[in-house]
């Protein structure tokens, strides 16, 4: 059995965090080496509630000042001693078993798969920039390649729930020099990596109406290669969309 560390980032959304962890513990049937929860709200009341509810289940990391999501991830990944990480956010509800095993089967089929999205195609396609390749299978596990529509340059990396290889993380020098997932994705794309989405979804996005602003994430103004500037109509959606 491959050794995996669980890392979850959270920022003050206790109700969503509880739903996420309750569903994860209900459906996960894969033995994990270590479980970390890093909380970035810098709110002592939140810290106390999380400690009371989850202190016996996970190793809790409470930031002493707000660091933002990416910095929190970088600091937590320094503690990881396993080749694989199951990365998770605080606003996803798990709906079935074997999702970690299914991720592993898919990622083992091609070292250039950077991650496996566990949500449905309908959920991922709320912003109409994705297309999906033909159905592929590893054993009984189906998946499709995620493709950005012509001109769009991202779609290759996300902090959505799923397996990440520590070797892939180290390949680009970690995330410390990046301000957003878009630029991380562009870097992986240059190296020939791509993303896939599972055919049998295992999570539901429950965070749409509870977006948390993160001033440390600097979103580039570019969105579509060669397109004129001023995509203001999409800007609001892009900032709240999950990558």
Where are the model-predicted features located?
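N-proximal low-complexity "stem/linker" segments adjacent to membrane-targeting elements
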Residues: 1-22
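C-terminal catalytic/acceptor-binding lobe
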Residues: 19, 154-243
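Short, acidic, metal-binding catalytic loop of nucleotide-sugar glycosyltransferases
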Residues: 22-32
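A conserved acidic beta->alpha catalytic loop
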Residues: 37-47
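Glycine-rich, basic loop-to-helix element that forms the pyrophosphate-binding segment
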Residues: 64-79
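Short beta-strand-to-loop acidic/aromatic patch adjacent to the donor-nucleotide binding site
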Residues: 83-93
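Conserved donor-nucleotide/metal-binding helix-loop-beta segment in metal-dependent transferases, i.e.
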Residues: 97-118
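Short beta-strand-to-loop element that shapes/binds the nucleotide-sugar donor at the catalytic cleft/hinge
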Residues: 116-131
